[in-house]
């Protein structure tokens, strides 16, 4: 577990895990690491892991809970086509409205904008 020591200008440089205490002690899994006012075991990161059986049980619960959402009614193909047709007609109306707006301005304004 290397640490970072920061001088006054905050550039910082690292020390390896062998020199943390400046005593030459090497840390093992059984050696606690000093963290401010308390000691934390260096193997603490391996605590709280779930077993495979526990994971399988929770996965089954999750599937049971969320499986109902996947069974939705199928949409008929003609409904999809009707919606697509409406969308196309709406975009065509919008496009034609945009064209008619630009034609109202007249040819001279249209060309002066391009220059």
Curated annotation (Swiss-Prot):
Q: What does the entry report about post-translational modification of this chain?
A: Cleaved near the N-terminus by the viral protease during virion maturation to form the mature protein.
Q: Where is this region: Disordered?
A: 85-115
Highest taxon of source: Viruses
Give GO MF terms, alphabetically. Answer: DNA binding
* Short sequence motif Nuclear localization signal: positions: 114-115
List the propeptide residues. Answer: 2-23
Q: Which GO terms describe its cellular component?
A: host cell; host cell nucleolus; viral capsid
Q: Which UniProt keywords apply?
A: DNA-binding, Host nucleus, Host-virus interaction, Late protein, Phosphoprotein, Viral penetration into host nucleus, Virion, Virus entry into host cell
Bias-annotated ranges (Basic residues): 85-99
Biological processes annotated in GO: symbiont entry into host cell; viral penetration into host nucleus
Concerning Pfam families, the annotation shows:
Adeno_VII
What up-regulates or down-regulates this gene? Answer: Expressed in the late phase of the viral replicative cycle.
Summarizing the function annotation, the protein's role is:
Plays a role in the inhibition of host immune response within the nucleus. Interacts with cellular nucleosomes and immobilizes the host immune danger signal HMGB1 on chromatin. In turn, prevents HMGB1 release out of the cell and thus decreases inflammation. Also plays a role in the wrapping and condensation of the viral DNA. May also promote viral genome import into the nucleus.
Q: Which family does it belong to?
A: Belongs to the adenoviridae histone-like nucleoprotein family.
As a miscellaneous remark, the entry gives: All late proteins expressed from the major late promoter are produced by alternative splicing and alternative polyadenylation of the same gene giving rise to non-overlapping ORFs. A leader sequence is present in the N-terminus of all these mRNAs and is recognized by the viral shutoff protein to provide expression although conventional translation via ribosome scanning from the cap has been shut off in the host cell.
| Subunit structure comment from the entry | Interacts with the core-capsid bridging protein; this interaction bridges the virus core to the capsid. Interacts with host NPM1; this interaction might play a role in placing the pre-histone-like nucleoprotein on the viral DNA or regulating viral gene expression. Interacts with host HMGB1; this interaction inhibits host immune response.
Task: Tell me what this protein is called.
Answer: Pre-histone-like nucleoprotein
Q: What organism does the record attribute this protein to?
A: Snake adenovirus serotype 1 (SnAdV-1)
Its lineage reads: Viruses, Varidnaviria, Bamfordvirae, Preplasmiviricota, Tectiliviricetes
């Amino acid at each position: 577990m290397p640490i970072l020591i920061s001088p006054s200008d905050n550039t910082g440089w690292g020390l390896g895990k062998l020199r943390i205490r400046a005593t030459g002690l090497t840390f093992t899994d059984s050696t606690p690491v000093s963290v401010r006012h308390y000691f934390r075991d260096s193997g603490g990161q391996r605590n709280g892991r779930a077993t495979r059986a526990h994971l399988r049980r929770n996965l089954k619960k999750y599937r049971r809970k969320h499986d109902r959402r996947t069974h939705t009614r199928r949409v008929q193909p003609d409904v999809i086509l009707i919606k697509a047709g409406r969308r196309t007609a709406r975009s065509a109306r919008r496009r034609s409205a945009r064209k008619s707006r630009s034609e109202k301005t007249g040819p001279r304004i249209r060309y002066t904008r391009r220059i």
